[in-house]
């Protein structure tokens, strides 16, 4: 009890984040299955469009704030950053504990918002006037706002902790450009969180006062403007999607360089600059989510151009990963499969992103399933594949146990087929004009929706199989005798699992 509730150990807190993220991920997956069941055939299954929208909203919030962020930043970040830096722990261990323990109440508030009155059926963007007191009477949206506040404070505190750790707790000889790529990725992610979340907090606080205190920030009747909310929200929302993917970039860099038998990734400095560029550019492209609100043509031209420029540093990363793989004998280990799947599918998602960055095309494709397909390719096959890659790669280090390699490979192929079958047809639906966030659709769209829903069942089966893989590893207790690879990074020089206090004295790194 003492160990888990009052923990100040970065490994224990990281493990808590993993367990919480896995639990939330199962809730989020269940919600996505409800969505695909509703859309599996024309006509109504749930029977109430408000309930459908509540499910969609909760699915998005849970997957983003309670699955991807806790696992990538909280789980892998806590576990690996101090060990990779040679630091005894995080800079603020008790703050670290507080950051975690704000998430369960936050999730509770979000689930409560779905269960009172008619729920928050606003979509994850929570746009007014739909989220106003008139269209959404009752406490649902207010509870969702408080949930976001808590999750946001948790992330900001975590970000401060990571930034301080990375700046202050490096060994003397580790200059900033020699830090491991994953540490860089988490550091940039933390800066993005620190700069973007306060803007979201401001926006939803104004929405809260609009709903309850009779202000009119977003109500035209009182001189407000709903477009202001969209600008504030997307100024957070766009950096947020890079927050979700950057730690994945860092992990994939480590996995590919290690599994390729290279001592470092190709173009390490270029990789760092690319991540920095993505982080900076992520803040100046937010209005590409709003091409349909009636902006000037020159504004749209700027946001189109700026969005396309992000493709350049992203391309640098893709080609550097391919460069790292060059000349190696590819060993198809499970972690390598996930990393290769990540690179390929993230590239596909990035290409549809370049399509959508054209404002003229986006006006037609906005709010269709093409957009859904695009961001699920980069999230459901980018962030999630990175999580899976990192998990199967570092599981032996974190637990000291090895998983069944054959089962993991089978799981990868089922999952790969499942997610592609789910989301690839949605490109066609979007091009055919099927809009997002509707519980029903004309019969014309039936065939691709049936295939999409079949794919979601496959992914669900794959998820169950992965839970079995973890159970099997825990039960079989195949203890690691030695590492499968030569260590590409300092964390593999530790015992499996590492000691409670990884570094008893200050480390000295002479050379890499």
From Swiss-Prot:
UniProt EC number: 7.1.1.9
Cross-link annotation 1'-histidyl-3'-tyrosine (His-Tyr), location: 238-242
Top-level class of the enzyme under EC nomenclature: translocase
Membrane topology classification: Multi-pass membrane protein
InterPro entries according to UniProt: Cyt_c_oxase-like_su1_dom, Cyt_c_oxase-like_su1_sf, Cyt_C_Oxase_1, Cyt_c_Oxase_su1_BS, Cyt_c_oxase_su1_dom
Residues reported to bind Fe(II)-heme a: 59, 376
Pathway participation: Energy metabolism; oxidative phosphorylation
Cofactor(s) of this protein: heme; Cu cation
Catalytic activity: 4 Fe(II)-[cytochrome c] + O2 + 8 H(+)(in) = 4 Fe(III)-[cytochrome c] + 2 H2O + 4 H(+)(out)
Chief subcellular location: mitochondrion
Binding site for Mg(2+): 366-367
Annotated positions binding Cu cation: 238, 288-289
GO molecular function, one term: cytochrome-c oxidase activity
PANTHER family: CYTOCHROME C OXIDASE SUBUNIT 1
Protein name in the entry: Cytochrome c oxidase subunit 1
């Amino acid at each position: 009890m003492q160990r888990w509730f009052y923990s100040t150990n970065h490994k224990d807190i990281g493990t808590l984040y993993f367990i919480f993220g896995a639990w939330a991920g199962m809730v989020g997956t269940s919600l996505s299955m409800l969505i695909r069941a509703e859309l599996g055939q024309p006509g109504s299954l749930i029977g109430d469009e408000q309930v459908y929208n509540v499910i969609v909203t909760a699915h998005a919030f849970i997957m983003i704030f309670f699955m991807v962020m806790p696992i990538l930043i909280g789980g892998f970040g806590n576990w690996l950053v101090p060990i990779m830096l040679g630091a005894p722990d995080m800079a603020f261990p008790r703050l670290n504990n507080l950051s975690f323990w704000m998430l369960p109440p936050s999730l509770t508030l979000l689930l409560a918002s779905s269960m009172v009155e008619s729920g928050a059926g606003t979509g994850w963007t929570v746009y007014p006037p739909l989220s106003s007191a008139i269209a959404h009477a009752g406490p649902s949206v207010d509870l969702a706002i408080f949930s976001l506040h808590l999750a946001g404070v948790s992330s900001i505190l975590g970000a401060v902790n990571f930034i301080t750790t990375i700046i202050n707790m490096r060994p003397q000889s580790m200059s900033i450009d020699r830090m491991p790529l994953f540490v860089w990725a988490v550091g940039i992610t933390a800066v993005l969180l620190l700069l973007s979340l306060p803007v979201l907090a401001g926006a939803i606080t104004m929405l809260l006062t609009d709903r309850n205190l009779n202000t009119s920030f977003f109500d035209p009747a009182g001189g407000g403007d709903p477009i202001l909310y969209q600008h504030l929200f997307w100024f957070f929302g766009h950096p947020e999607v890079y927050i979700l993917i950057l730690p994945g970039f860092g992990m994939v860099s480590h996995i590919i360089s290690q599994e390729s038998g290279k001592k470092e990734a190709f173009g390490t400095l270029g990789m760092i600059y690319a991540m920095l560029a993505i982080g900076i550019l992520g803040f100046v492209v937010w209005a590409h989510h709003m091409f349909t609100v009636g902006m000037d043509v020159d504004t749209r031209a700027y946001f189109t151009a700026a969005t396309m420029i992000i493709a350049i540093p992203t391309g640098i990363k893709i080609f550097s990963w391919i460069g790292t793989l060059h000349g190696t004998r590819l060993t198809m280990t499970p972690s390598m499969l996930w990393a290769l799947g990540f690179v390929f599918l993230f590239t596909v998602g990035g290409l549809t992103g370049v399509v959508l960055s054209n404002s003229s095309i986006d006006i037609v494709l906005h709010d269709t399933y093409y957009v859904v397909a695009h961001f699920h390719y980069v999230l459901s096959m980018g962030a999630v594949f990175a999580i899976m890659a990192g998990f199967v790669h570092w599981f032996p280090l974190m637990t000291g146990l090895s998983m069944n390699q054959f089962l993991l490979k089978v799981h990868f192929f089922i999952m790969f087929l499942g997610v592609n079958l789910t989301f690839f047809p949605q490109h066609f639906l979007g091009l055919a004009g099927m809009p997002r966030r509707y519980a029903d659709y004309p019969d014309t769209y039936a065939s691709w929706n049936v295939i999409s829903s079949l794919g979601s069942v496959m992914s669900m089966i794959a998820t169950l199989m992965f839970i079995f893989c973890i159970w099997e590893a825990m039960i079989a207790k195949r203890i690691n005798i030695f590492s499968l690879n030569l260590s590409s990074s300092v964390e593999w020089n530790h015992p499996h699992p590492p000691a409670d206090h990884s570094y008893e004295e200050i480390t000295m790194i002479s050379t890499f």
